[in-house]
């Protein structure tokens, strides 16, 4: 098929054929990595890693992805270590980055910032998270994880648990899941419910959606996607303290499930996912992190127009 996504800015840009193509290419990349044949695909290419908001997994996995492909990385971490702290605009920063690198990955606390960045330059731009907006590469690796763990998506019951209001990983993954015949269970306190704009975007698709405050709804689900309460997004810290411990996933809850519920988490976790779940075979969140590297290797290659 003809895949034409130089920039990766949000999940709305991907059609079902795009996703089928991406999943297939990630499988190919995974095999190349297993056979030690991926190194050298992006030799001579330079990635600008621009993280203006805290990150461990996403930043390291993108940088590891570029290195594993034979490319190199230049980076900046935090506003205080960039000229933005001196008053430089994101537009000007990106114009400078364009002079140095072949592709840029950006995380920024302002929703919509990746579009500003992409509009400033001709090099590919990948959104690694823009405030409470989206995290498209996380959604793609999450999609790949579910398919790898379950063998399919169609017919699955998928629970999203925790902060559905501010959780950009949830916003992004739900946008991709609308292309599949799934049942979504949204488990959260009313104050952290999924925004109406995302619910409306699901209308007209073959999935179904149910909202509940009952954590035991996870017992009937094939996948439980757990997220932390996003403390940094709350305007009122007292509200965070009131809500942060309402939904907790532990071993006892998962073992009581009617199905072998696969547990996913984009990480980092705080106390919403107990460590006693870690030794269960259906705890897939560390495998999920590993899938992130091959997924991002694939996206880097495709954004740069390098087939494999």
UniProtKB/Swiss-Prot annotation:
UniProt GO molecular function: amino acid binding; aspartate carbamoyltransferase activity
Gene this protein is translated from: pyrB
Positions that bind L-aspartate: 86, 168, 228
Lineage top rank: taxon: Bacteria
Family: Belongs to the aspartate/ornithine carbamoyltransferase superfamily. ATCase family.
UniProt keyword Transferase, yes or no: yes
Entry keyword set: Pyrimidine biosynthesis, Transferase
A GO biological-process term: 'de novo' pyrimidine nucleobase biosynthetic process
Pfam families in alphabetical order: OTCace, OTCace_N
Role this protein plays: Catalyzes the condensation of carbamoyl phosphate and aspartate to form carbamoyl aspartate and inorganic phosphate, the committed step in the de novo pyrimidine nucleotide biosynthesis pathway.
InterPro entries hit by this protein: Asp/Orn_carbamoyltranf_P-bd (IPR006132), Asp/Orn_carbamoylTrfase (IPR006130), Asp/Orn_carbamoylTrfase_sf (IPR036901), Asp_carbamoyltransf (IPR002082), Asp_carbamoyltransf_Asp/Orn-bd (IPR006131)
Recorded catalytic activity of this chain's protein: carbamoyl phosphate + L-aspartate = N-carbamoyl-L-aspartate + phosphate + H(+)
Subunit architecture: Heterododecamer (2C3:3R2) of six catalytic PyrB chains organized as two trimers (C3), and six regulatory PyrI chains organized as three dimers (R2).
Pathway assigned to this chain's UniProt record: Pyrimidine metabolism; UMP biosynthesis via de novo pathway; (S)-dihydroorotate from bicarbonate: step 2/3
Keyword Transferase attached: yes
Protein name according to UniProt: Aspartate carbamoyltransferase catalytic subunit
Enzyme Commission designation: 2.1.3.2
Amino acids binding carbamoyl phosphate: 57-58, 107, 135, 138, 267-268
EC class name: transferase
Regions crossing the membrane: none
